[in-house]
C-alpha cells in the first residue's frame, strides 16, 4: 500500500464576496490530490484536500516541505499498525519532522490541506463515509445525520444586506 503521487494546484476562488476585512476577488487556495496504489472498483484511490478561503495558496510550504517528506517516507511510516490503511497520525508525524513545535497559521493551513486529503483516502479505502469511519475509530460507532454549524454572518455579496442573508 503506497502513495504513488501527490499533486498540488493553485485554484482561484473567483468570488466577489467580502467581509469587513477581506475581499475574496483575488484570493486563491491550494488543492491537493493524493494518489495511491490501492484500487477500489478498478480505479486508484485518490484523496482530495483543500483549505478554507480567507488565506492564500500555501504552495511553497506544500511543495518544498510537506509533500517531499511524505514522498520520501518508508511505507511503514505512513500505514496503520495492521498495514490495512494509511495512518493520519503517522503521516502527520512525517510532515512535522524538523518543524518547530506550536501552531503557525500558514503551516497549519498546509498541513490541514494534506490531512484532509489523507482522511479522504482512508475513508475511500474503507468504503465508508468519513463520519462513519470516525465514529467507529474514535467513538462508539454511533453517528447522527445532524451536526451543529457556525453561521458567521458577514460574507456579503455586493448589493446584498443583512435582510437578504
Predicted regions and their residues:
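Structured beta-strand/loop patches that form or line metal/cofactor-binding pockets in enzymes
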Residues: 1-59, 65
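Metal- or metallocofactor-binding catalytic centers and their adjacent structured scaffolds
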Residues: 39-126
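Metal-dependent enolase-superfamily TIM-barrel catalytic cores that perform enediolate-based chemistry
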Residues: 140-165
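Residue-level detector of flexible, active-site-proximal loop/helix-junction positions
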Residues: 10-13, 137, 156
